[in-house]
């Protein structure tokens, strides 16, 4: 694997870490704290 390819793959990994993890945490936080009240 060439260094440029390795850097590209690591940039994808860190991009996912920086974007996906905070988004997931935010969605879980919102879903827990802002539950929709449904009448039965």
From Swiss-Prot:
The chain crosses the membrane at residues 12-32. GO terms for cellular component: photosystem II; plasma membrane-derived thylakoid membrane. InterPro entries: PSII_PsbX, PSII_PsbX_type_1_subfam. It is a single-pass membrane protein. One of its GO terms (biological process) is photosynthesis. It comes from the Bacteria. The keyword Transmembrane helix applies. This is Photosystem II reaction center protein X.
């Amino acid at each position: 694997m060439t260094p440029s390819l390795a850097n590209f793959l690591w940039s994808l990994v860190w991009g996912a870490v920086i974007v996906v993890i905070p988004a997931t945490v935010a969605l879980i936080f919102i879903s827990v704290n802002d539950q929709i009240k449904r009448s039965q």
